[in-house]
Amino acid sequence: MSQIDKMAKIKKLREISDAPFVDCKKALENSDYDIDLAINWLNKNGKSKALKKSDRIAAEGLVLAKKDANSVLVFELNSETDFVAKNQNFINLQQKIGELLLANDFVNLEDALLIQDEAGRSISELMILATATIGEKITLRRVFKTKYSLEQSVEVYTHSNGQIAVITILKGGNLEIAKNISMHVAALNPQYILKVEVPNEKLQEIQLEVEKKAFAEVKNFEKKPENVRVGILKGMIDKQLSEFVLELQPLATDSAVTVEKYLAQNSATLEKVVRFEVGEGIQKQNVDFSAEVNQQIQEFQKK
């Protein structure tokens, strides 16, 4: 390899890793001028700034739901900015990680990070390499995977912007039914799947609120027969619960029926629904860009 080619490799490695010239040169010399091996060398020796970005908050990114003939999964891959989440390198990484997760068994997230690709690189290492290349912290935040049987109807839905993904597992039914439920859950994000999942305290609170409303707004409510009052209260309670309980909600694709009735009409029972949305529960970092620029200027002036 000519000296010019070596210098070009050093320049490229510096751009990727943001490591000093001397460290890039040494990394390449110890890696037979292979860029990927050199990045690994920098990471192992703590010279790459990719590892130093590990304390940053990654709250943007993409989610993806996938399935094969036996398993279904949904996972979230995070970056620091929405801009990077739209980067083709990030999208390619997400697809690769999805394939690895679907093809391999694991018991938890830590176990999943150890899964290796055909070149022997773990998912954790792939993310470190991508962090060095892209310039932002990249993390596999969470993943849900389960196996299913032929008696179950399983479908996945990932919204076109990659911000919401849902998997639905039904006993009976068919793929179209499962797909419609997945799309419904993606759009409405119900807090509970079944009415029985709602905590008793919350149910009691709603019941008291509805009873007061019934006496105040339903004409001659107190004079109606007991069975009529019970029916009115149940309808009012279910209507309020339908704001956050899946089975009581009007189906997004056909508001004439509730999800519960839609499933019953198609001989289907809801067994599992999992919905991931990018950044759920993450406290996003507030960045003062003006202060950041001023700090960089001050550091530059000290050199």
From Swiss-Prot:
Keywords: Cytoplasm, Elongation factor, Protein biosynthesis. GO terms for molecular function: translation elongation factor activity. GO terms for cellular component: cytoplasm. InterPro entries: EF-Ts_dimer_sf (IPR036402), Transl_elong_EFTs/EF1B (IPR001816), Transl_elong_EFTs/EF1B_dimer (IPR014039), Transl_elong_Ts_CS (IPR018101), UBA-like_sf (IPR009060). It is found in: Cytoplasm. Belongs to the EF-Ts family. NCBIfam families: tsf (TIGR00116). Associates with the EF-Tu.GDP complex and induces the exchange of GDP to GTP. It remains bound to the aminoacyl-tRNA.EF-Tu.GTP complex up to the GTP hydrolysis stage on the ribosome. This is Elongation factor Ts.
